[in-house]
Each structure stands twice: as structure tokens, then as C-alpha cells.
Amino acid sequence: MIWHVQNENFILDSTRIFMKAFHLLLFHGSFIFPECILIFGLILLLMIDLTSDQKDRPWFYFISSTSLVMSITALLFRWKEEPIISFSGNFQTNNFNEIFQFLILLCSTLCIPLSVEYIECTEMAITEFLLFVLTATLGGMFLCGANDFITIFVAPECFSLCSYLLSGYTKRDVRSNEATTKYLLMGGASSSILVHGFSWLYGSSGGEIELQEIVNGLINTQMYNSPGISIALISITVGIGFKLSPAPFHQWTPDVYEGSPTPVVAFLSVTSKVAASASATRIFDIPFYFSSNEWHLLLEILAILSMILGNLIAITQTSMKRMLAYSSIGQIGYVIIGIIVGDSNDGYASMITYMLFYISMNLGTFARIVSFGLRTGTDNIRDYAGLYTKDPFLALSLALCLLSLGGLPPLAGFFGKLHLFWCGWQAGLYFLVSIGLLTSVVSIYYYLKIIKLLMTGRNQEITPHVRNYRRSPLRSNNSIEWSMTVCVIASTIPGISMNPILAIAQDTLF
């Protein structure tokens, strides 16, 4: 009899929870329509995988890419609508959040065609790979719109869990297993520290979890200058620092870049930074409004360490992916300048513009590394010597992306850095901008060193990998060529006419 009553109570409670979830989705679903499209794509992928055979593999790519493109379209149709807070304060929809969501979707859309040839050659499980990519994208999008601590914690964990699984996707590779272990352990530790910081803010504000309500709570409790806020600031900076991977929170980055499958590295190298940057701008600017001097100082230290260590250590690397890992650490130092400048002096606009260019430059470089690695089986920088003699198209496109990463005019990277540094200079960050300019010159050195190897024609310098290189024919159905071409064009042309891009970024009201 007791069991019967308990069973009935369980059914009633489950029904209430289901009805509440259905009610929220019915009345608030339009606010997360782009995310709902991705969820539908995930369900469709699972259904087709259960009911189809290996001959239907092209459908998996088509469904994933279509879901992402439709989600981008839904975001564009929603552009410039009034800011809305939905799901009982958990989620905020505005232009600032949406432009970061657009960048994440753009990264994923370009990464899927970049991965097709790699998956086919290595015989990786395609369905799980695409499921993890879409789920990580979903987590990143929710993080961009998160408006309370629970969502800010759950969304990046969704992204991180998929990232761990993707980085260890080649289970028989010892380097991949080592990278995944480090990534998982450090990710778990950073999440714990992040939650510790949230708990201090929660207690100091009188039990508030929404970002704006925390500010009001700190005013009411008069705790906005208390030692607890300083502890919260340091803890949250460490937690977010792991996601952004600036120095000294970069220890996992080189190993994960070197050990993970190259398409996975391409995906993680941009999406994680975009999502973490979106979260960092809102967390630092709203709950820590009264501690702006303190978090500005912390971020300045991180930016200086990242720009110096990242670019100097990159010079000594012999692995292409490991070099790009340290290069990305230096690049995030430039992005932090935009976060520090903030809404004044177009800091956020310059940061968003530079991140758009960084996506194209970085993914274009990784597309070439994927193509070269599949044909030679090597990642050593010396093995790229003389590639121009065998595959001029690959060598030239790789050179353009590297030059754009270095910031040489008239490529997109130059104009992106120029506007970012100019905004920092106007905000009075003279020392930070000077370090950025000097380290940019250093980065040009190691990029030009690689380009010199690419263009060499000396037989004694050309390795057997290039001598036996099989050139990939340019075909209209070669997805990696399409992805690479889009990235190369986006790394060059937009820099010449970047005013429209800046205008769009400036329209993103915080």
C-alpha cells in the first residue's frame, strides 16, 4: 500500500515537472529558437544513425551543416530585436550575446567540411563526432546568453565534456590519451575553482544568482568592497582563465593541440575562446562593476604574460600544431585588451571584429595542416620545406593565413590588430599596447620562418615527405578545399573594407 502511494506521488511529481518544462518551452521557446534547431538536428542524427547503414554517411554531414546554417539564419532574422530575459531570468537575448553565438555557429559550420576527409581517412566514428560537435556548439551558445550562475556553470560543462571526448577521440593514440587526461583533470579543477568564486558572490549578495540582481544585492548588503569579493574575483578569473587559456593558465593547451585530432583542435581553438570571451565580458562588467580597477589589473597581467610567453615560446617549437598552440596564447592576449577597454572606446567592437578575423585565419591554417598531414603523416615544421614546388595552392593559402595571423598589411589580421591596439591606446593602456606591438613583430618572425621553408627550392632542404607528396586535385566536391578557400578569402579581403564589420559590431548594445 505504501509502495502504491509512493509510486503515485512519483508519477504526479514527474508529470508536474514535465508540464512545467513543456510550459517553459511553449512560451519561451521562441527566444532559443536557434538552439532548438540544433537540438532537433541532434535528435535527427541519432534517429538516422539507428535506422541506417554506412551508405548514408553523407546524410550525417548534410544534416549537421544544415542545422548550423538554419540556426545562423534564425539568428540573423532575430537581429536588432529588443533585449529579452527569459526562462525565469536564466537566459538573456540581445545583440551582444547573439553576435558571439553567430561566431560560434560560424566556427562549427566551417569545421564540419574541414573534418570530412580526415574522418574518412582515419575511419573515425562519424555520428558520435558530429554529435559532440553540435552539442559543444549548443553549450557554447547557451553560455553566450547565460544570465545566472547555474546556466553559466552548466553551459560550459556541456561544452567541456564534449571537448574532452573529442580530444580523446583517437583512443589508440598515446598522445591523445595523455592530452585528454591533462585536459580533463585541469578542466575539473578549474570548474571547482569557478564554482567557489560563484559561492562567494552568492553569499555576499544575499543569495542572488542573476547577474544584475547580484549587483543590487551587493549594494543592499554593502559587501561590494569586502574581502569576499576579492576572493570571488580571483577564483572566477582562474576558472575563466582555463577556458581562455592565457598564461599562466595555458598548461593544457600545447598538449591538447599536439595530441588531439587536427579537426578537433581547429574546432576547440576558436569556439572555446569565443564562448569564454562572451562569458568573461558579462561576468567582469556586471557583478564586478564595483571592482573594475582590480579586474582590469588582473587581466592586464594575464594579457602581458600571454603576449610575451606565447610568442617567445612559439619560436622554439618544431611541431606545427604546438607552435599554433603557443601562438593562440599570444592571440588571446590581444583579445584581452578589448575586454579591458570594454564598452568605451569601441573595445568590445574591436574585440569582436578581431575574433571574426581570427576565426578565418586560424581555421584556414588548420585546414592546410589537415590536408598536409593526411598526405604525409607528419606535423614537423621542417617537413613543410619545399611544399610550394609540389602544391603551390596549398603553400600559398597557408602562407596567406600565417601572414594574416602575424598582422602584415593589407591582410585582415593587420587591420584587426590595428583597430584593437588603437582602442587600447585611446583608453590609456600604453604599456599594454606597446607590449602587443613588440610581440606582434616577434610573431611575424616565426611565421615568416615557416613561409621561407614553404617556398624553398633547394633539394637538400626538401624532406622525403614532400618529395613523395601526392597533390590533392581541386574538385568541386572536396569539402576541405571549400572550407579553406572561404577562410583564406575572409583572411584577406575583409581587412581592406572592414568599416561595415565594425559598424555591425558597434551596434551590439551590452
UniProtKB/Swiss-Prot annotation:
GO cellular component: chloroplast thylakoid membrane
Localization (cell): Plastid, Chloroplast thylakoid membrane
EC class of the enzyme, as a word: translocase
Catalytic activity: a plastoquinone + NADH + (n+1) H(+)(in) = a plastoquinol + NAD(+) + n H(+)(out); a plastoquinone + NADPH + (n+1) H(+)(in) = a plastoquinol + NADP(+) + n H(+)(out)
Keywords: Chloroplast, Membrane, NAD, NADP, Plastid, Plastoquinone, Quinone, Thylakoid, Translocase, Transmembrane, Transmembrane helix, Transport
Transmembrane segments: 24-44, 59-79, 99-119, 124-144, 149-169, 183-203, 229-249, 295-315, 323-343, 347-367, 395-415, 418-438
InterPro entries: NADH-Q_OxRdtase_suN/2, ND/Mrp_TM, Ndh2_N
One Pfam short name: Ndh2_N
NADP as UniProt keyword: yes
Membrane topology: Multi-pass membrane protein
Major site of localization recorded for this protein: plastid
Key word Thylakoid present: yes
Molecular function GO labels: NADH dehydrogenase (ubiquinone) activity; quinone binding
Any single biological process term in GO: photosynthesis, light reaction
Record EC number: 7.1.1.-
Domain of life: Eukaryota
Signal sequence extent: none
Main function: NDH shuttles electrons from NAD(P)H:plastoquinone, via FMN and iron-sulfur (Fe-S) centers, to quinones in the photosynthetic chain and possibly in a chloroplast respiratory chain. The immediate electron acceptor for the enzyme in this species is believed to be plastoquinone. Couples the redox reaction to proton translocation, and thus conserves the redox energy in a proton gradient.
Complexes and interactors: NDH is composed of at least 16 different subunits, 5 of which are encoded in the nucleus.
Family per record: Belongs to the complex I subunit 2 family.
Name assigned to this protein: NAD(P)H-quinone oxidoreductase subunit 2, chloroplastic
Gene label: ndhB
